[in-house]
Amino acid sequence: MKKRVLAVILGAVMTMSLAACGSSDAGKTSSDDGEKSYTIGISQFAEHGSLDNCREGFLEGLKEEGIEEGKNLTVEVKNAAADQGTAKQISDGFVSDKVDLVCAIATPSAQAAYNSAMNSDIPVVYTAVTDPVAAKLAKEDGTPAGNV
């Protein structure tokens, strides 16, 4: 039940994030039926059951909101193999590719994505971050920092 609620929340956040970028057509293509298509970059810090569940729950939440891989969504999943330098390279690549959104899984990937996307209009969502304030992903009052 907890995972399902998390997936729905993440899906709603994703939908709102994509809607906020709706005026820009960069990186978007049309699917066969004329519906907009999106590309999401998922940066996962390491292979781990809990982190895998976060990724799967995120994608399930999107599907429940009508954003489905193979239909109107392209997903690029990359794993940093527990290396912060690799996490930074992954995030830089997503920004360079102008994905529509970056989903970062675990604190080091979230920090890398935040720093890479800081001067872009690419929204960043994250999961599996224990303390967003300490990670400098949120302000002291809990509001997001930048485009996170």
What are these regions (language model features)?
Residues 1-13:
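Positively charged n-region of N-terminal signal peptides that target proteins for export
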Residues 4, 22-148:
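Short hydrophobic alpha-helices and adjacent helix-cap/hinge residues
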Residues 16-20:
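C-terminal motif of bacterial Sec signal peptides marking the signal peptidase cleavage site
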